[in-house]
Amino acid sequence: MRNNVIQALFDSLPSNGIGAVRYNFRGVGNSAGKHGNGELEVLDSQAAFTFASQLVQNIPVFSVGYSFGADVSLAADHKHLAGWIGIASPLALIEPEEMKAGLDDRPTLLLVPENDQFRSTEEARTICEPWVATSLEELAGADHFFLGFTQPVVNRTTSFIAEFVGQG
């Protein structure tokens, strides 16, 4: 939760008219519990989606995750989710074929840094080729940590959500 990507999104989305809820997974920061290797963290995500959907009725909820959080985000599902955005997802911590986002007709955006140290764009494209309703976009010049590249992440996340919220 305390990194440049999540902080930039949390600071920028509300000023673009998009609400944001951020949370730590179990065992991170002041959160209780033990790390669950992704499986238990999916439950944390689903609880966060329930919370977000109860804040304001009939508002689309998008799951946005970065790095490990992206894998968890893409694996989690909830009846109120409108779609998924995975930022620098390793596509390895949870089996990609088990990720709900890849099996669903709701929209999914994968933002892959051109110079990601953990998963190349071509590897990500190959892994996600069978996914439905999924767009994969490379962010030129960025590496996995997006130092100096958070604004393109914020811009594309905002525009992707706006595309689908504007349809409803």
Where does each model-flagged region fall?
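Short beta-strand/loop motif that positions the catalytic acidic residue
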Residues: 103-105, 109-112, 116
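Alpha/beta-hydrolase active-site loop signature
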Residues: 25-29, 91, 143
